[in-house]
Amino acid sequence: TLFASQFSLIDKLTNTYYETHGTKRDKEAIYTQVRNEIEKLQTNKRYIQQLEDIVNKHKGNVMQLLRESMPEFSEMDHRLLCFIYAGFSAKAISVFTGDSVGNIYMRKSRLKAKIAQSNSENREDILRYIP
């Protein structure tokens, strides 16, 4: 669940902090742990699928509706919208995707427009969760 995964991450970071606090390598160890978690969101398909499952569970199966309604979207488009639905900031998404913050906003706007102009009966449900 979202609750368990959030606290699991905090637990990992806290353990790393506890084990390295006061040493020369404490900042490096925390940085490495954070970098490892970010890399999961960049490349680990299982981890990304878990995020999508959480979004579906808490946001009315919006990712399922999106995938069914907009099959022409690329996997990166789906992933961007999943990150947005999950509540990540443009800066965080920029780190996950390697794209600039400006491009994140531009892609988000372009995708919203495509969804709004689509003939999908689910377009309002899909757009509801995009701020």
Q: What does each model-identified segment do?
A:
Residues 36-131:
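Cytosolic nucleotide-binding catalytic cores of signal-transduction proteins
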